[in-house]
């Protein structure tokens, strides 16, 4: 979660970075890259519509330098001008939540089907509401020899804080509960969360919100980044486990800016190897592939935790579109290969259709 958007993201502490990528398709060869560049007319034009903070965190010098070597040209889109008068573009990257802009982009997609828009605005909408955000994970009901993937039981509260205790009791949710804003709109406030230990504190919350049952997970969270058909996992510190003492001696609401920087003592903590162990690759590959297909997205990450004491039970607790890739080790090469693969796939389809 965020306090000051990108500024607070820099304060996230990594426990350990997973050293290996999990590709779902082979990387581009030198010959394939050359073919892609040729198809793109000697250069690949990527238009971007991002906030200033997103531009700073994503379009870092190393990425731009590598892009130039691969004949990829990033062009800023002017939102004050008609999109059809700009370009031409091969790919459009965007992360703006303005509804008018979303409609402009949808209209542009219809008029220019040859341009790849990352990602379709209508697909992104599912991640702007926490009531629908995790539904695809729940519907997937993923369980195999490598583990089980669940979502926390949750309850949506639209209004009237005083009604929350009775609503929680009726739904049968177990304390403690994590409260998150219902709408994710890119602001720091929409990424804040609160932890409520007792029933009497629930009426102190501010709807509309989603209440999720807190699952003890050893204070470790796995951030799983998805870029097309490649995934990478990074460990982060998270909220500490809750015990009986906490439940009996905390009667208020504890507020945190984001899950992965919620504890001040994490930096010096010793991590149990059984807690820090990454989820099995086959499980992550299956989950990443299914979410990409069901969500209709190619740029996202999801936060996953392992239930403490249950080696094979995992929970997805959040999904984010176009996350902070700048904090993902080696993101520059991964992203450039992804952009080139998009044009390569277009080239293959063009050949098969001719």
Swiss-Prot record:
According to its UniProt record, in which tissues is this protein expressed?
Expressed in roots, leaves, flowers, anthers and embryos.
User: Any idea where the ATP-grasp domain is?
Assistant: 140-347
Q: Quote the Pfam families the UniProt record gives.
A: Ins134_P3_kin (PF05770), Ins134_P3_kin_N (PF17927)
Q: Which residues bind 1D-myo-inositol 1,3,4-trisphosphate?
A: 53, 95, 191, 223, 320
- Which InterPro entries does the record match to this protein? Inositol_tetrakis-P_1-kinase, InsP(3)kin_ATP-grasp, ITPK1_N
Look up keyword Membrane and say if it applies.
Answer: no
Induced by what?
By drought stress.
List of residues binding Mg(2+) 1: 303, 318
Please share the entry's free-text remark on the cofactor.
Answer: Binds 2 magnesium ions per subunit.
Q: Which controlled-vocabulary keywords does the entry list? A: ATP-binding, Kinase, Magnesium, Metal-binding, Nucleotide-binding, Transferase
GO-annotated molecular function: ATP binding; inositol-1,3,4-trisphosphate 5-kinase activity; inositol-1,3,4-trisphosphate 6-kinase activity; inositol-3,4,5,6-tetrakisphosphate 1-kinase activity; magnesium ion binding
Q: What class of enzyme is it?
A: transferase
**What EC number(s) is this enzyme filed under?**
2.7.1.134, 2.7.1.159
**What function is annotated for this protein?**
Kinase that can phosphorylate various inositol polyphosphate such as Ins(3,4,5,6)P4 or Ins(1,3,4)P3 and participates in phytic acid biosynthesis in developing seeds. Phytic acid is the primary storage form of phosphorus in cereal grains and other plant seeds.
- According to UniProt, the name of this protein is Inositol-tetrakisphosphate 1-kinase 1
């Amino acid at each position: 979660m965020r306090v000051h958007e990108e500024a607070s993201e820099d304060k996230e502490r990594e426990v350990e970075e997973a050293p290996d990528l999990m590709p779902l398709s082979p990387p581009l060869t030198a010959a394939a890259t050359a073919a892609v560049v040729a198809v793109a007319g000697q250069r690949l034009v990527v238009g971007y519509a991002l906030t200033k903070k997103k531009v700073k965190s994503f379009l870092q010098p190393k990425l731009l330098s590598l892009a130039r070597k691969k004949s990829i040209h990033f062009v800023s889109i002017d939102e004050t001008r008609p999109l059809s008068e700009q370009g031409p573009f091969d790919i459009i990257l965007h992360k703006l939540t303005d509804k008018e802009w979303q409609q402009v982009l949808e209209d542009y997609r219809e008029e220019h089907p040859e341009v790849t828009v990352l990602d379709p605005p209508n697909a992104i909408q599912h991640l702007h509401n926490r009531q629908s955000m995790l539904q695809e994970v729940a519907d997937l009901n993923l369980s195999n020899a490598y583990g089980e993937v669940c979502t926390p039981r949750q309850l949506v509260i639209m209004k009237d804080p005083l009604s929350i205790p009775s609503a929680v009791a009726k739904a049968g949710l177990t304390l403690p509960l994590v409260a998150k804003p219902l709408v994710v709109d890119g602001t720091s406030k929409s990424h804040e969360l609160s932890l409520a230990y007792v029933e009497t504190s629930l009426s102190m919350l501010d709807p509309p919100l989603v209440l999720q049952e807190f699952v003890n997970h050893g204070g470790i969270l796995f951030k799983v980044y998805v870029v097309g058909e490649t995934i990478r996992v990074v460990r982060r510190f998270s909220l500490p486990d809750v015990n009986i003492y906490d439940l009996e001696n905390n009667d208020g609401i504890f507020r945190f800016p984001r899950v992965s920087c919620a504890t001040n003592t994490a930096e010096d903590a010793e991590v149990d190897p059984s807690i820090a162990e990454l989820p099995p690759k086959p499980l992550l590959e299956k989950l990443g592939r299914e979410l990409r297909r069901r969500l209709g997205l190619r740029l996202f990450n999801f936060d996953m935790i392992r239930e403490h004491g249950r080696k094979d039970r995992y929970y997805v607790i959040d999904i984010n579109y176009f996350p902070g890739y700048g904090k993902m080790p080696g993101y520059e090469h991964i992203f450039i290969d992804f952009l080139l693969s998009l044009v390569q796939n277009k080239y293959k389809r063009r050949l098969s259709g001719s």
